[in-house]
Every structure is written in C-alpha cells, then in structure tokens.
C-alpha cells in the first residue's frame, strides 16, 4: 500500500497545523474580549492649540490672498501670514491663518449672519485658544460726508445695530418725523460700547500713521460741499452702524444718526455690515473688553447735491469715488501699529488693557 503510506504523514501535519491555527485564533478572540492587548505604538499627543494674541477679521477678499487686486484681507495676509499653513475650521467660510507670534486672521464673509457664523465656528474650534485674545474687526465702509471722507480710517467707539427695531414707510408718517422706533427686549444686543481704554490706546498708537490717497479720490471729494468730505484722509473714531441693508441717501443717513443718538452712542461716522453681530458672538464667550472695530471709508453714504440717490448707487463708468486700493492699505497701516504693539508688549497686555 505505498500510496496510503505516503499520504498519512502529510495528512497528520496538515491536521496539526490546523489545530494550532484554531488554538491561536481562539486565544486572540479571548484576548480581545478580555484584557486588551498592549500596543507597542504610543498614541500621538494631541496638538497644542494656538495661543491667539490678536485675531484680525476681514469680511471679503476679491481674488487670491496675495498677488492680485487687494480686498480687505490681502495686505494683512502679506504682512503676517505669507508663510502660514491654513487651518481649516468646519463651519467657517475660509481658513484661519496664524503666525509664530500668535497673530491670527481670517475672512469671515459679508453680512451679519455670514460673519457671525464663521466667528462662532472659529471661537469654538479646539485648535485655537482665545482665552487672552484681542480682536480687530476690519474692513471697508461708508461714511456721511458731514463726518468723514474717502480714505479715512475709523476706530469704533460704539457699535449699533441699524436693523433691530420697528420701521415704516415715510409716506405712512408725519412728514419729516422719524420712521424708526426701538423694540423692547433688544437692549443688550442692539448696541455695544467698546472698551474706551482700548480705543484710547488704538488712537494713540495709530493717529499719525501715514495715509495713502489718490488723485481720483481727491477730485471726487470736491463734488461735496462739506468741509469734512473735502479734506485729506485721517484716523478718527466714532459710532459704527451695522446693517445688513446697504442703506443709502440723506434720509437713511439722517436716520442712522438719529438711532445713534437715541441709544446714547457717539456720532455715527461709519456704516458697515458685520461688527455688531461679530461682537455679540465674541461677547457670549469672552466679553467685549478686547474688541476693536477698524474701518476704512470707500464711499459716502449719500450722493452729492447734484445727483439722486439712485445715480450715486449706480454711477456711470468713471464716476465712482476712487480710492479703494488706497483705503484698504490705509486700514492695514493703521491696524498694524496696534497689532504689533500688543504682541511686542504681550507681558503687559495679556492680563488686560494696561493703563496709559
């Protein structure tokens, strides 16, 4: 029986190997059901969050962050974050950038809802530690010709929400009477007074920043009779009016000034679309003592006496105000003086705004 004799050892070996494999499998199952097996690979430590010292918020960029026509973010990006790795934040419109000094920034999106949603997502993300951060809300804006001019840069003393309240059509009212009434229940978030000590520091550090101007802006200013509208750009301060509606015309401008006074705020000098909403988001997590609003005026909030409001809103080619490129650079020039000072003097600033 040579055939049966030659196959018997092979069958025995296969049977033995199968038994050993089954035993090993059962042992592995028992180990997984009982005490976990010890891993030979140590778990990677969690990344330490970035300690944010100053967060710069812009609302839009025209194209890329560098190398093309600059919007609100590009000059900041080129100064602080050209070598930074973007931090993608779920829920935010664009990435956050941070440098080694703790200066961070992002484009949040235009309008109250858009910008507030991005700011909330950024504040809640564990990659960033805002426990001692200062905030600079920046961008372009409009100004009444009686209070400012093209190229101006303004620090906000008060942020007032233009939208919250009751409003009705002028034809349903006594001629010349206000068409706005505040609504009860909005008192805690319809206006914010920003820290006067911080505004004072901002003005002290930036008041003499060199301002850029353009021939087109200088010529455009002469269309307005007001002395404030005709002067060269400067650094100032006052109430920033936040409204989702791009309100326009002397009547709406007068109403904005009326609301500012109704709320006990300073003169309305800037119209913008985000700051009060962003401030409310920050307030609920960190308070308002370290918030700054910085805006550059790129248009007047009304036409000159020789044009209608609609003509001013939709100008013919070559009839625009000019000065946009210079203004977005002015905003960064003014703001960097405060950012750089806070970072350089961080031991004095980390616990709060120091005495001057």
Annotate each PLM feature.
Residues 3-20:
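Bacterial N-terminal signal peptides that target proteins for export
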Residues 27-28:
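C-terminal motif of bacterial Sec signal peptides marking the signal peptidase cleavage site
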Residues 31-356:
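Accessory terminal and edge-of-domain segments that mediate assembly/interaction
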């Amino acid at each position: 029986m040579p055939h049966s004799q030659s196959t018997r050892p092979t069958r025995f070996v296969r049977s033995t190997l199968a038994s050993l494999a089954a035993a090993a499998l059962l042992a592995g199952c028992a180990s997984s059901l009982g005490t976990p097996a010890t891993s030979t690979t140590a778990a990677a430590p969690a990344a330490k969050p970035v300690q944010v010292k100053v967060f710069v918020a812009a609302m839009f960029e025209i194209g890329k962050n560098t190398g093309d026509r600059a919007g609100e973010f590009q000059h900041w990006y080129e100064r602080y974050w050209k070598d930074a790795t973007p931090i993608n934040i779920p829920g935010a419109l664009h990435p956050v950038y941070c440098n080694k000094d703790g200066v961070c920034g992002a484009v949040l999106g235009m309008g109250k809802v858009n910008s507030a949603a991005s700011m909330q997502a950024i504040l809640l993300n564990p990659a960033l530690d805002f426990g001692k951060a200062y905030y600079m809300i920046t961008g372009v804006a409009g100004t009444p010709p009686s209070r400012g001019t093209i190229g101006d840069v303004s620090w906000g003393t008060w942020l007032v929400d233009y939208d919250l309240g009751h409003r009705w059509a002028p034809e349903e009212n006594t001629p010349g009477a206000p068409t706005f009434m505040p609504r009860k229940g909005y008192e805690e978030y319809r206006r914010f007074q920003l820290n006067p000590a911080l505004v004072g520091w901002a003005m002290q550090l930036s008041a003499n920043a060199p301002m850029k101007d353009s021939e087109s802006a200088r010529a455009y200013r002469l269309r307005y009779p007001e002395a404030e509208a005709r002067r060269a750009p400067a650094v100032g301060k006052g109430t920033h009016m936040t409204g989702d509606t791009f309100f326009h015309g002397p009547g709406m401008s007068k109403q904005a000034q009326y609301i500012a006074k109704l709320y006990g705020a300073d003169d309305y000098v800037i119209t913008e679309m985000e700051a009060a909403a962003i401030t409310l988001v920050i307030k609920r997590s960190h308070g308002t003592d370290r918030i700054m609003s910085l805006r550059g005026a790129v248009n007047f909030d009304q036409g000159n006496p020789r044009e209608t409001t609609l003509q001013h809103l939709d100008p013919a080619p070559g009839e625009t105000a000019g000065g946009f490129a210079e203004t977005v650079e002015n905003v960064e020039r003014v703001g960097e003086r405060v950012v750089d000072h806070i970072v350089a003097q961080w031991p004095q600033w980390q616990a709060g705004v120091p005495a001057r």
